[in-house]
Amino acid sequence: MLQPSRRKYRKEQKGRNTGIATRGAKVSFGEFGLKAIGRGRLTARQIESARRAMTRHIKRGGRIWIRIFPDKPISKKPAEVRMGNGKGNPEYWVAEIQPGKVLYEMDGVDETLAREAFRLAAAKLPLETVFVHRQMG
């Protein structure tokens, strides 16, 4: 699963996920892409689960790019622990997603196969997504 190898600080404040994606909003590596039209956060497990679904569907052909990375730690207190006594330990990693962000890209396969692979991947994600083509020019 994806997670940063080194970080300056172990824990991060909650923050707010606002705005729309301006960077990473175009298909730039492959021919087809899966673009988020919803807002939310994807865990490292969800990103990996969607990647596996796509990889299994396209078998040997094609190439997949993951355009997102879970770089935000989410901390959680253990079960049945009283409030206070500091912040909990980092439990898992998430990528914050704004509408318009390209999540995955694919190349080397025909459109019908890519559409089906992205449909299977989208079923694993808690966001609304749309299939997109590369814009020429």
Curated annotation (Swiss-Prot):
Any Pfam family: Ribosomal_L16
Gene Ontology cellular-component annotations: cytosolic large ribosomal subunit
Domain of life: Bacteria
BP GO annotations: translation
Alphabetized UniProt keyword annotations: Ribonucleoprotein, Ribosomal protein, RNA-binding, rRNA-binding, tRNA-binding
InterPro entries: Ribosomal_uL16, Ribosomal_uL16_bact-type, Ribosomal_uL16_CS, Ribosomal_uL16_dom, Ribosomal_uL16_sf
Gene3D superfamilies: Ribosomal protein L10e/L16
GO terms assigned for molecular function: rRNA binding; structural constituent of ribosome; tRNA binding
Entry's family note: Belongs to the universal ribosomal protein uL16 family.
Assembly description: Part of the 50S ribosomal subunit.
Role description: Binds 23S rRNA and is also seen to make contacts with the A and possibly P site tRNAs.
Protein name according to UniProt: Large ribosomal subunit protein uL16
